[in-house]
Amino acid sequence: MAGVGAVSRLLRGRRLALTGAWPGTLQKQTCGFHFSVGENKKASAKVSDAISTQYPVVDHEFDAVVVGAGGAGLRAAFGLSEAGFNTACLTKLFPTRSHTVAAQGGINAALGNMEEDNWRWHFYDTVKGSDWLGDQDAIHYMTEQAPASVVELENYGMPFSRTEDGKIYQRAFGGQSLKFGKGGQAHRCCCVADRTGHSLLHTLYGRSLRYDTSYFVEYFALDLLMENGECRGVIALCIEDGSIHRIRAKNTVIATGGYGRTYFSCTSAHTSTGDGTAMVTRAGLPCQDLEFVQFHPTGIYGAGCLITEGCRGEGGILINSQGERFMERYAPVAKDLASRDVVSRSMTLEIREGRGCGPEKDHVYLQLHHLPPEQLATRLPGISETAMIFAGVDVTKEPIPVLPTVHYNMGGIPTNYKGQVLKHVNGQDQIVPGLYACGEAACASVHGANRLGANSLLDLVVFGRACALSIAESCRPGDKVPSIKANAGEESVMNLDKLRFADGSIRTSELRLNMQKSMQNHAAVFRVGSVLQEGCEKISQLYGDLKHLKTFDRGMVWNTDLVETLELQNLMLCALQTIYGAEARKESRGAHAREDYKVRVDEYDYSKPIQGQQKKPFGEHWRKHTLSYVDIKTGKVTLEYRPVIDKTLNEADCATVPPAIRSY
């Protein structure tokens, strides 16, 4: 893997003592790089003390830098390298440790291997699943690109499960239909048993090794380098040796994943801390729709580990304490394969009404033991293992205790379907020059208010590729990289120094736990105004407590105390925007279910014919995207709104799906 650890080796031999500070100057040292950095294309990286003599900064120059090396980041990075761009990929984890590896169920594409299918039907299902908050131009792009994207993965060597005649096996998944919702259940989810994310990530990583991409592994991105409204790279901390690095680039792609760890119980890795989302917030740019947090119906009770929707796609059913298949009452047609927000709310209602399972009656059961053992062994081997380890359940004999668990963030950094980051000025979308985003960190918005299962892996590969294509359309390899100020990134280093020597009264772990429990209690599956208001006050108070943090490790080498504190800052910014956005949205839509505002508020009442109705003004309905900003010093959240894009990329080829009452 080209470039891994090369930058760390630049400073090796000048390591800090665990409790020491950086020396004021660094002796010159040459180190052979295969990639180009600095003004002299053959020179090694430059060390500058323009920011601080205590924290010398190593400067690098690339055509493009990708932050994050999960599915989206890898696809963007090797797409850029393939096009000839001198590309850096910066990641706080080794690439195959990224959270993409945890995805289980599959990736949607209308291949038609199990029955006739059409990408336009997939488009319809995704728009409906989004509760008409998704942007239909982006959904059009994603669903049309889906079949080719899956074939591309197959050509890269991804070992999909197969039908008897050798085609890619496709299972049923929630919210998927044929013939625009009128043809029954679709089998559209391509899978590798129940380990699809693992296979996808390793396939993309293996593919990336073909290209001359420079990987900065175990580097923590601190902030974007912004000049005159343009993004010109990132500043990062090398976790291994504590060195600071400014990576200057004409194009920056954020692919840092979601912020699931704002909640106490979630299926996300502990590294899902919204780093990119927070960097954009600190840059003064908006985030979009953060109030829409998906609760996956089936997290293992007490552990939060994911049990894939593929279990229900293979024939598993949800039952209550009376042994009743209760989803038949809530979604008579789709039943257990209704969309995730519908199933999670139904489970919560069953528990509330006293039909929960166990001594506390606080969960339900997922039953699989009626399925043939050979089907469980071949299609759901990972789930069988996970259920035994985390619940002590043999799925061939007994049901799995499950509970809705935070799983995915529909909101993120606002982009168009090309991956270009947007801001909204005077009622118009404007592109932020040099900045792109993809994957769960981004909000295109293809998921709207609720994501369909197996659309997330599709999102990664389609929009990771889209970012690379967009950059290739507008730039050429070797284009001049815009300059940055000599002290660019100074505030980031000052913040790092402040946290490193923080000597307050609250531990990072204590404050993080308080935040997570507050989010879990105040912004859950069902929400109510008074509780949300209390949550806003609580999270604002906790944000203020950041100045009272106490860290214990004063060193710079593998200072995990410092890294976790930096992550907590990022989580706090995400939590603030999530709960304030939820309190402000006075309706129920998708994953945002208000008990005091139970109906969806559109520009028309779509439960009735719209003829004769007067369209509500923009300020009086909620079919619009939330844009949130945070004052970093005070924690004050400011909300604005932008309209949903209803037009597709080609109305003649793919007609807009008009809003309707959503039922399954």
Swiss-Prot record:
Q: What is this protein called?
A: Succinate dehydrogenase [ubiquinone] flavoprotein subunit, mitochondrial
NCBIfam families the record matches: sdhA_forward, sdhA_frdA_Gneg
Record's subunit section? Component of complex II composed of four subunits: the flavoprotein (FP) SDHA, iron-sulfur protein (IP) SDHB, and a cytochrome b560 composed of SDHC and SDHD. Interacts with SDHAF2/SDH5; interaction is required for FAD attachment. Interacts with TRAP1. Interacts with LACC1.
Q: What gene name is listed for this protein?
A: Sdha
Q: List UniProt keywords, sorted A-Z.
A: Acetylation, Electron transport, FAD, Flavoprotein, Membrane, Mitochondrion, Mitochondrion inner membrane, Oxidoreductase, Phosphoprotein, Transit peptide, Transport, Tricarboxylic acid cycle, Tumor suppressor
Catalytic activity line of the entry: a ubiquinone + succinate = a ubiquinol + fumarate; (R)-malate + a quinone = enol-oxaloacetate + a quinol; (S)-malate + a quinone = enol-oxaloacetate + a quinol
Q: What is its EC number?
A: 1.3.5.1, 1.1.5.-
Q: Which residues form the active site?
A: 340 (proton acceptor)
- Residues modified as Phosphotyrosine are 215
Q: Which GO terms describe its molecular function?
A: flavin adenine dinucleotide binding; succinate dehydrogenase (quinone) activity
Organelle targeting peptide span: 1-42
Checking Gene3D superfamilies in the record gives: FAD/NAD(P)-binding domain (3.50.50.60), Fumarate reductase/succinate dehydrogenase flavoprotein-like, C-terminal domain (1.20.58.100), succinate dehydrogenase protein domain (4.10.80.40), Succinate dehydrogenase/fumarate reductase flavoprotein, catalytic domain (3.90.700.10)
Tele-8alpha-FAD histidine modification, residue list = 99
